[in-house]
C-alpha cells in the first residue's frame, strides 16, 4: 500500500513555512487525538500519520531528504550510502513541544512522567435566588482517588517498584527507521521506566480506585448560566502520585416565574388596578430580599417602568448590585356585578363632552391620527 505524501497529510503546500506546518499539525492532532476518539482505530491511524508527517517536515535535514528522495529516504536501504552519515538523528517526542500541557506535557529524551489526573465537570442547576444571593451546595462526584493502602504507588505496602530492565528506567527505547533513530515508549513498562512486580491488592497496581466524593461548593453571589467554578485538585487523582486534576462546576440558572434576568439587572411585571393607576397609591413589589413598597403616581399608564436601584443581583467581581426594573400593568376589571357596570357607565359618561380629550390624551391622539390617515388615502 502506497504511503500518502506528507504535505498532503497535513494539508499544506510544499513551500509551507514551519509556522504553517505547526498550525496544521495542531488542528489535525487535536481532531484525531486518541483521547477524543476512544475506540476509533481509523482516527488512531490518522493521528500516527499526522505525527510522522510533522516530525519529518519540521526537521530541516529530514525535510530536505524527503523533498529529494520522498519516502525512500526513511526506508531501510534508502538513499544508498549517502545521506547524513552514520550517527543518525533522534526524533525525540515533539508532541509536548507543540501542545505544552494541553495533553499533559512533553516527554522529550527521558522517562515518561506519571500523568496528571483528568479534569472533571459537574453540571449544577441553581434557582435565581441561589445564584443571586450565593449559597453553599453539597455535591457527590464519582471519580478516581489515590489508593490509601499503597498511598498511590500501585505497589503492595512494604514493597516498591523496580527499574525496567528493557529500557533501564528511561521509559523509552530506540528503534531504527531508515537512517534515523526513533524514540518510542518502552513496550514493557509503557513508558514509565518502572515495573510493579507485587501490585497492591486494592487498586491492582493502578494507584487509584473509584470512589464517590462528597464536596461542599461555595457559590458566589451573581453567578449566571455558563459560568464555571474551578475547584483545584478535586478532579481525578494523578497516576502514581502525580498531581490531581481539577473539578469544574458548570452553572445553569433555572428560569424564574416572576423575574427575568439581564446581566445583574432583574425585570418583572406588577399588575395594578385601574383605579390605583388613576388615583395613585402604593403596591408591593417582590425582590430577592423580600417585598418592598413602590409608590404609584397619579395617572400612571400601563407599561410605565420604574427603576429600583440596588434591588438586582450582586456582581461576582464588582459586588455591586444591579437594579430591579418594574413594569406596571394596568388591569381591566372582570366579572363585574350589575351595579359595578352601572357605575362604570356613569364614569364613562362623565368623560363625554368638550373635556373628553384632556381625560384620554392618548386615545384622542390615536383617533385623530387614524382620521388623518384615511383622509390622506381618499385625497
Swiss-Prot record:
CXXCXGXG motif repeats: 147-154, 164-171, 186-193, 200-207
Pfam families reported in the protein's UniProt record: DnaJ, DnaJ_C, DnaJ_CXXCXGXG
Cytoplasm keyword on record: yes
GO cellular component: cytoplasm
Disulfide bonds, paired cysteine numbers: none
Residues where Zn(2+) 1 binds: 147, 150, 200, 203
Entry keyword set: Chaperone, Cytoplasm, DNA replication, Metal-binding, Repeat, Stress response, Zinc, Zinc-finger
Needed cofactors: Zn(2+)
CDD domains linked: DnaJ, DnaJ_C, DnaJ_zf
Subcellular location: Cytoplasm
Domain J intervals: 5-70
Gene Ontology biological process terms from the UniProt entry: chaperone cofactor-dependent protein refolding; DNA replication; protein refolding; response to heat
Domain of life: Bacteria
Subunit structure as annotated in this protein's UniProt entry: Homodimer.
Function: Participates actively in the response to hyperosmotic and heat shock by preventing the aggregation of stress-denatured proteins and by disaggregating proteins, also in an autonomous, DnaK-independent fashion. Unfolded proteins bind initially to DnaJ; upon interaction with the DnaJ-bound protein, DnaK hydrolyzes its bound ATP, resulting in the formation of a stable complex. GrpE releases ADP from DnaK; ATP binding to DnaK triggers the release of the substrate protein, thus completing the reaction cycle.
Entry comment, domain topic: The J domain is necessary and sufficient to stimulate DnaK ATPase activity. Zinc center 1 plays an important role in the autonomous, DnaK-independent chaperone activity of DnaJ. Zinc center 2 is essential for interaction with DnaK and for DnaJ activity.
Family label: Belongs to the DnaJ family.
NCBIfam families: DnaJ_bact, PRK10767.1
HAMAP family: DnaJ
Protein name: Chaperone protein DnaJ
Species this chain originates from: Aliivibrio fischeri (strain ATCC 700601 / ES114)
